[in-house]
Amino acid sequence: MYAVIKSGGKQHRVNVDELLKVELLKAEKGETIKIEDVLMVVDGDDYKIGQPVVEGASVEAEVVEHGRGKKIRIVKHKRRKHYHKEQGHRQWYTLLKIKAINV
């Protein structure tokens, strides 16, 4: 059984006991959250597709940790003008462990 959920403007396919990195959520470490933006649920040959979400479906997940991703480098450069600008960015994330998929 798996589900497709929406979190942070992105869609994620999730299974039970799977770890998932999503955009930063306002939840404490160890807290259990309920995600109700379930777009699709598949159980063997049986599937439910929401329009836009599946009614009554939810995914329960536990917050494992909050952290920051790897640094990316943003570089701007203009040739022949001695202009060179570099900037770094690290995106915050929340690591979730999927506990249950409820239909």
Curated annotation (Swiss-Prot):
Keyword Ribonucleoprotein: yes
Residue runs in coiled coils: none
GO biological process per UniProt: translation
GO molecular function: rRNA binding; structural constituent of ribosome
Domain of life of the organism encoding this protein: Bacteria
Pfam family membership, one: Ribosomal_L21p
Any one Gene Ontology cellular component term annotated for this protein: ribosome
InterPro entries reported for this sequence: bL21-like, bL21-like_sf, Ribosomal_bL21, Ribosomal_bL21_CS
Keywords, ordered alphabetically: Ribonucleoprotein, Ribosomal protein, RNA-binding, rRNA-binding
Keyword Nucleotide-binding tagged: no
Subunit structure comment from the entry: Part of the 50S ribosomal subunit. Contacts protein L20.
HAMAP family: Ribosomal_bL21
Protein role: This protein binds to 23S rRNA in the presence of protein L20.
Family of the protein in this entry: Belongs to the bacterial ribosomal protein bL21 family.
Stated name of the protein: Large ribosomal subunit protein bL21
Gene that produces this protein: rplU
